[in-house]
Amino acid sequence: MLELTKRITHVDASEIHDNLVLPYELRIRGRLRATTETNLDVGLFLDRGPVLRDGDLLEAKSGEIIRIRAAEEPVVTARVETGLPLARLCYHLGNRHVSLQIGSGGAIGEDDRMGWVRFPPDHVLEELAERLGATVVHHTATFDPEPGAYNQAGQGHSHGHSHGHSHNHDHEHSHGHKHAH
C-alpha cells in the first residue's frame, strides 16, 4: 500500500503518478484506504486540515505524487437569478449549516444572469430552494463545496471570540451563590 502523508502545492504534470477519485464525504477525512484509477492501493495518513479539493496533490512517503479528483455523485443544483435572489438562497441554505458549492452561468448557451447552488440531496433544502424561486434539478456531478471562512490549513474551528480554557474555578452568578467547576 502506498502511504500518502503530505499535501503539496505544485508539481509538473509529468510528475503525477496517478489520480485518486473520491466523493466529498471521503475528501473530508484525513485517514482512509482507497484505490486509485490504476487500481493502486493507497492509504491517506494526513494531519487534520482542509478538505481535499479537486486537483489537490498528495505525496507518498516513497515520493510518488497522487492527484485528487472529485468524484461524480448524486447532487441537487438549484438555479436562480444572480444578485439578491442568489444571495438570499445562499444565506438561507448556509444558515442550515449545509455544505454548498456556488457558481454562476454554466454550460455554453446558458444565461450568465443565472447562478446556482449545489448541495447533497435533501428534500427539506430542495423545498426551501423552490420557495425562494429556484429551479431544482437532481443529477450527478462533482461536488466541491466552498471551504468556509474558518477552514484554513493548520487552524482549528473558531467563531472570532474565545471562551477560555479552564477546568477548575469558582464564579458567581447574579442569583447570589457560587458554583464550583
Swiss-Prot record:
The keyword Chaperone applies. Residues 143-181 are annotated as: Disordered. It comes from the Bacteria. Gene3D superfamilies: Urease metallochaperone UreE, N-terminal domain (2.60.260.20), UreE, C-terminal domain (3.30.70.790). One of its GO terms (biological process) is protein folding. It is found in: Cytoplasm. InterPro entries: UreE, UreE_C_dom, UreE_N, UreE_N_sf. Keywords: Chaperone, Cytoplasm, Nickel, Nickel insertion. The keyword Mitochondrion does not apply. One of its GO terms (cellular component) is cytoplasm. It holds the Pfam family UreE_N. GO terms for molecular function: nickel cation binding; unfolded protein binding. Belongs to the UreE family. HAMAP family: UreE (MF_00822). This is Urease accessory protein UreE. It comes from Marinobacter nauticus (strain ATCC 700491 / DSM 11845 / VT8).
